[in-house]
Curated annotation (Swiss-Prot):
Protein name (Swiss-Prot/TrEMBL): DNA polymerase delta catalytic subunit
Subunit annotation: Heterodimer with subunits of 125 kDa and 50 kDa. The 125 kDa subunit contains the polymerase active site and most likely the active site for the 3'-5' exonuclease activity.
Domain of life assignment: Eukaryota
GO BP: base-excision repair, gap-filling; DNA replication proofreading; DNA-templated DNA replication; nucleotide-excision repair, DNA gap filling
Molecular-function annotations in GO: 3'-5'-DNA exonuclease activity; DNA binding; DNA-directed DNA polymerase activity; metal ion binding; nucleotide binding
Alphabetically ordered keywords of this record: DNA replication, DNA-binding, DNA-directed DNA polymerase, Exonuclease, Hydrolase, Metal-binding, Nuclease, Nucleotidyltransferase, Nucleus, Transferase
Enzyme nomenclature, EC number: 2.7.7.7
Function recorded in the entry: This polymerase possesses two enzymatic activities: DNA synthesis (polymerase) and an exonucleolytic activity that degrades single-stranded DNA in the 3'- to 5'-direction.
Catalytic activity, reaction form: DNA(n) + a 2'-deoxyribonucleoside 5'-triphosphate = DNA(n+1) + diphosphate
Gene name linked to the record: POLD1
Primary enzyme class: transferase
CDD domains assigned to the protein according to its UniProt record, in alphabetical order: DNA_polB_delta_exo (cd05777), POLBc_delta (cd05533)
GO CC terms: delta DNA polymerase complex
Length: 1088
């Protein structure tokens, strides 16, 4: 070997040694970091199990949150006579001590019913069993199940459909091996099966569409969110733990003790609620994509149910981050470390409920797909089952009440994912569902103002800039928790689950009908009734006449109008007349059954139902129980002192009210679980009859001939209420007459139908059917509020200008009693619109996207815009279920409205002019005329024509320097300008300093999207101060919001000085920013 070769070998050895040492140091560092993280996480684990639980010597009592099932091998010890794959029910919950529970329930089997053919005996059943087993084996050739049809039993049941004089008849209960085989078996029976002596026969199936978990809950008398007990000695610790729960055990379903949610068992367990948010570093001009863009921060807040403040606050950051007071900042060097740390955090903290805003559509799917791209196979194990990965799939939810929405279903086994965005869309009608807008509306709080376009810059900065981003991320995790508490979602949803008997997750993922069906199945089971499949039940065709609305006598009433309301009208009708599936007599049976005429109710729509003396209906029984329970809950609520108990009781009474009102809709849903138009049409026909009856009695009794001062006049009737003008001038007198009328008329109705007096409107503006406004009085001393129905103050699809204009006019007319002032106010607003002095945010229209563009028969403005936005940037374009904000722009003459709709941000950034005439003719004119026509003789001529409509200015948003519009008047220059949104800006600039800042920069600075789409704020003014921060000039913008809200919002954005000097304004304390604006400064407007 030469000397040169020796040196080469030595170099290789040294290099290999160095590489080895580097790898070893990396491994050691990774181990140290993991150990440090484990030590950190250990503080946040659940309390340890007591000796009694460990030794299985004490009973287990827990509140269940989630129920599902899994297919696994039969438990040999609990079920010695069973083998092969079976369905095992899993119940997840929490004990009162805060221990997590996974209860594996064995022995419950799926089943359904068919009507037994006449003359079928035990031998025939055995042969039928063999034939059905053979057909099942053919249909499921790839299955490893030993026996598909476990057994067939003859039982005595009766169909819920139609009145029958016999108590019961033979049914066959078919028990199958696995839940998925119910549908397979049903299909075989629907198509027909060859039977000896009967030939090819098809069978009507009963309860074959009941979900397996719900079937289990019904048969075991378990309702959503209730407490379940298992006595000591009746459960066995799972031999090999399959979950991460502290308590995991197996038991037979017959050993479960289900407690009704009353008294001590109405309380809530200390659930752990995790609220989280993620931030991603997107590329410039692109919405973050998990295939390219890293997750840079994850903020977490964990709260115990019933407590105000989180007991865990942390943020996991990629790279260093400066400390945040009260927050555990956890920096990591790589994205892989961030994701795995969050996975470990989830496992250690073990949350029962995971919340956030849009987490099901964005945060969770993004994390899962990002980990997949980084090849972190172990990341998606976020549920409570070992080695089980989170599953994400696209879903489309559609119902008449909630509309159609595209989303994603995220299955985190053993935990409830509670997406606040989805809940807000289901429960509230808002113009905008952005987190900023919703938080502003309900909490008077807003997000930290960091525009998405600078997130990557903040991440690429230093520890201080990443701290700013972390505060932003933490706020986005904090606001959903505040919304959850403020709106009492946990209490309300748990109570709804308890009342209706469905799992909590069903309330989030399904419509209304499953809740009524659950109650119906429970009551039917108690009475040995069975429910046929929906498609074969009741009437499938036809429509029925809706509720009566008495002709509205439009006008402006300056005397009190008493309102008489029916208490729970539709539920009361169903109870009073015993309307139910099982009390309905079909025409062909009416003569055969030979029912005495006095024992039936013939409804105004021509249907026949037996009275309760022959058979009490199930629907009336359910309604009676719900309404009685609601009265009890409301009475308990008045007596309750504990805030948590009050929250539970209030949630319960609300759930009971909603459930009672849902029953009628369930019967009328033609594509529902069990439609029956005979019931729904009978209910509405009785309602129409009662409204007419009430009108006649009021106008017959309250007359001058009967000694009253004036003749009463019914000016309007709407579904379940009647408006009466008794002619008196005093509110108190109208109230007394209203009470007298309600008591007199109630006595003429069948109980429990009751007419109640609740309120007086004074004054009252009746515009047309379903449209009115008035001051709402429940006490004679003072009015409670201004109440409106069907007009633009409560409609979401009008621009904010219309809502504000209508609301302010009504305020002047009804409260100020200043009609001339209201007229002048409208003229001023129209003039401002035509002269381009109107805030752009007031012109934004929002509409829901319920279908894709191809599914609409007629082209719509918001739909066409959504398609154009999708072509520009598919990632940020609206999806089905979103609300689309847009404005109408100037275009060629004859262009359709759908061709002129445009994204407000796009309009601002591209200096596109707005079409004021569209807004005048299509947005303002009709709502304003509806209000003023009952008041003014020539409303159209006075309001929409005249000198205030003759001056028109069309200017576009400018992108040149903002000082182009100002004149130098003082050393400290003060300007007000019209900047697209027409907020008022007051810019304070150091002497001789010049600011160069484009409209586009201001758009970023002010986060315009936060305020577009009618977010609920009317921005009156703003101040911009320029100070030095991080060695660069920074603009701090203060918004002065509507005085009633007192919101103070400020953002920071770098600005460029053009004179090359280093002169800046003095540094202001933040408190100095909250000064009132000078409102006397003259406008300086751009000229077209």
């Amino acid at each position: 070997m030469t000397q040169e070769e020796e040196f080469m070998d030595e170099d290789v050895f040294i290099n290999e040694t160095l590489v080895s040492e580097d790898e070893e140091s990396l491994i050691l560092r990774d181990i140290e970091q993991r150990q440090a993280l484990a030590n950190r996480l250990s503080k946040w684990t659940r309390p340890p199990l007591s000796a009694g639980y460990v030794a299985q010597s004490r009973s287990v009592l827990f509140q269940q949150l989630e129920i599902d099932y899994v297919i696994a091998e039969s438990h040999g010890e609990l079920l010695p006579n069973s083998s092969g794959p079976v369905a095992i029910i899993r119940i997840f919950g929490v004990t009162k001590e805060g221990h997590s529970v996974c209860c594996n329930v064995h022995g419950f089997e799926p089943y359904f019913y068919i009507c037994c053919p006449p003359g079928m005996g035990p031998d025939d059943i055995s042969h039928f069993h063999q034939t059905l087993e053979g057909r099942m084996r053919e249909a499921n050739r790839n299955s490893n199940v030993g026996k598909f049809v476990r057994r067939i039993e003859m039982v005595q049941r009766r169909s819920i459909m139609y009145y029958q004089q016999s108590n019961s008849q033979p049914f066959l209960k078919i028990v199958v091996a696995l839940p998925t085989m119910v549908a397979s078996c049903r299909g075989i029976l629907d198509r027909g099966i060859q039977l000896d002596g009967l030939g090819m026969k098809s069978f009507l199936t009963y309860e074959s569409n009941v979900l397996f978990a719900l079937r289990f809950m019904i048969d075991c008398n378990i309702v959503g969110g209730n407490w379940i007990g298992i006595p000591a000695g009746k459960y066995k610790k799972t031999a090999k733990s399959l979950s991460y729960c502290q308590l995991e055990f197996d038991c037979l379903y017959s050993e479960l003790i289900s407690h009704a949610p009353e008294g001590e068992y109405s309380k809530m367990a200390p659930f752990r609620i995790l609220s989280f948010d993620i931030e991603c570093a997107g590329r410039k001009g692109h919405f973050p994509e998990p295939t390219h863009d890293p997750v840079i921060q994850i903020a977490n807040l964990v709260t115990l149910q019933g407590e105000d403040q989180p007991f865990i606050r942390n943020v996991m950051t990629l790279k260093s981050c400066s400390p945040i007071v009260g927050v555990d900042v956890m920096p990591f060097e790589t994205e892989r470390e961030v994701l795995l740390a969050w996975r470990d955090f989830i496992r250690e903290v073990d949350p029962d409920i995971i919340i956030g805003y849009n987490i099901c559509k964005f945060d969770l799917p993004y994390l899962i797909e990002r980990a997949l791209n980084l090849k972190i196979a172990e990341f998606p194990i976020l549920g409570r089952i070992r080695n089980s990965r989170v599953r994400v799939k696209d879903t489309t939810f559609s119902s008449r009440q909630y509309g159609t929405r595209e989303s994603k279903e995220v299955a985190v086994e053993g935990r409830v994912t509670f997406d606040l965005l989805q809940v807000m869309q289901r429960d509230y009608k808002l113009s905008s569902y952005s987190l900023n807008s919703v938080s502003s509306h309900f909490l008077s709080e807003q997000k930290e103002d960091v525009h998405h376009s600078i997130i990557s810059d903040l991440q690429n900065g230093n520890a201080e800039t990443r701290r700013r981003l972390a505060v932003y991320c933490l706020k986005d995790a904090y606001l959903p928790q505040r919304l959850l508490d403020k709106l009492m979602f946990i209490y309300n949803y748990v109570e709804m689950a308890r009342v209706t008997g469905v799992p909590i997750s069903f309330l989030l993922s399904r419509g209304q009908s499953i809740k009524v069906l659950s109650q119906l199945l429970r009551r039917a089971r108690q009475k040995n009734l069975v429910i046929p499949n929906a498609k074969q039940a009741g009437s499938e065709q036809g429509t029925f006449e809706g509720a009566t609305v008495l002709e509205a006598r439009a006008g402006f009433y300056e005397k009190p109008i008493a309102t008489l309301d029916f208490a729970s009208l539709y539920p009361s009708i169903m109870m009073a007349y015993n309307l139910c599936y099982c009390t309905l007599v079909i025409p062909e049976d009416a003569r055969k059954l030979n029912i005495p005429p006095e024992s039936v109710n013939r409804t105004p729509s021509g249907e026949t139902f037996v009275k309760s003396n022959l058979q009490k209906g199930i629907l009336p029984e359910i309604l009676e129980e719900l309404l009685t329970a609601r009265k009890r809950a409301k009475a308990d609520l008045k007596e309750a002192k504990d805030p948590l108990e009050k929250a539970v009781l209030d949630g319960r009474q609300l759930a009971l009210k909603i459930s009672a009102n849902s029953v009628y809709g369930f019967t009328g849903a033609t594509i529902g679980q069990l439609p029956c138009l005979e019931i729904s049409s009978s209910v509405t026909s009785y309602g129409r009859q009662m409204i007419e009856h009430t009108k006649k009695l009021v106008e017959d009794k309250f007359t001058t001939l009967n000694g009253y001062e004036h003749n009463a006049e019914v000016i309007y009737g709407d579904t379940d209420s009647v408006m009466v003008q008794f002619g008196v001038s005093a509110v108190e007198e109208a109230m007394n007459l209203g009470r007298e009328a309600a008591e007199h008329i109630s006595g003429t109705f069948t109980k429990p139908i009751k007419l109640e007096f609740e309120k007086v409107y004074y004054p009252y503006l009746l515009i047309s059917k379903k449209r009115y406004a008035g001051l709402f009085w429940t006490k004679p001393d003072n009015f409670d509020k201004m109440d409106t129905k069907g007009i633009e103050t409560v409609r979401r699809d009008n621009c904010l200008l219309v809502k504000n204009l209508v609301n302010d006019c009504l305020h002047k007319i009804l409260i100020d009693r200043d009609i001339p002032g209201a007229v002048q106010y409208v003229k001023n607003a129209i003039s401002d619109l035509l002269m381009n002095r109107m805030d752009l945010s007031l012109l934004v229209i929002t509409k829901g996207l319920t279908k894709t563009g191809d599914d609409y028969e007629v082209k719509a403005a918001h739909v066409e815009l959504a398609e154009r936005m999708r072509k520009r940037d598919a990632a940020t374009a609206p999806n089905v279920g979103d609300r689309v904000p847009y404005v109408i722009i100037k275009a060629a003459k004859g262009a359709k409205a759908y061709e002129r709709s445009e994204d407000p941000i796009y309009v601002l950034e591209n200096n596109i002019p707005i079409d004021p005439h569209y807004y005048l003719e299509n947005q303002i004119s009709k709502p304003i005329l509806r209000i003023f026509e009952p008041i003014l003789k020539n409303a159209s001529k006075e309001l929409l024509h005249g000198s205030h409509t003759r001056s028109i200015s069309i200017s576009t948003p400018s992108n040149s320097g903002i000082l182009r519009f100002a004149k130098k008047q003082l050393p400290a220059l003060v300007v007000k300008l019209y900047l697209a949104r027409v907020i008022t800006l007051s810019v304070h600039i150091a002497k001789e300093g010049r600011l160069s800042c484009t409209v586009k920069q201001y758009l970023k600075c002010l986060s315009w999207r936060c305020f577009l789409g009618g977010c609920g704020h009317s921005v009156r003014s703003a101040k911009v101060h320029f100070i030095r921060m991080f060695s660069a000039p920074v603009g701090i913008v203060q918004f002065s919001i509507d005085e009633k809200r007192h919101r103070k919002i400020w953002v920071k954005q770098s600005c460029n000085w053009t004179d090359g000097t280093s002169k800046f304004c003095q540094e202001f304390d933040l408190a100095d920013l909250f000064e009132p604006m000078d409102t006397n400064t003259i406008w300086c407007l751009p000229q077209s």
